[in-house]
Amino acid sequence: LLGRLRASTGAVVDLRHDVVVGRAPAATPRPGRPSPELLIITDADKSASKVHCAVRVEDWDLAVEDLGSSNGTFLLRPGRAPRRLAPHSPEPLAVGDVISLADAATLTVEDADE
């Protein structure tokens, strides 16, 4: 267990393997990997895409990847300006980072012990 992902919607997901996030997430497992967990974000305004982003688990590291979302995935890191992620370009994650899905929801990376 590398940590937890806490959504502003109240959902909490243990980061044991990949997590795909969106209004109607769907995913095919990467070769040699278990099926990703699907985290549904309820968004009446539809600012989040159906398949918005993924949190990738690679050995002992975490990364976030925008999956071609319409309104963008943003990385909010303490002490730095918010940054929009380039689509399909994984970005390393650390405990304390916040992922913003357009204006629909935020996902906070927490330590597994919290």
Regions found by a protein language model. Name each.
Residues L1-G3, S69-S70, A94-V95:
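A short, compositionally biased
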Residues V21, V51-V55, D61-E65, N71-L75, ...:
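Short hydrophobic/aromatic patches on the structural cores and recognition surfaces of FHA
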Residues L1-A44, A105-T108, A112-E114:
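Intrinsically disordered, low-complexity acidic Ser/Thr-rich regulatory segments
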Residues G10, D18, D59-W60, S69-S70, ...:
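A generic structural motif
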Residues L2-R6, T73-L75, I99:
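Short polybasic amphipathic segments
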Residues V57, L76-E114:
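C-terminal boundary/linker segments immediately following FHA domains
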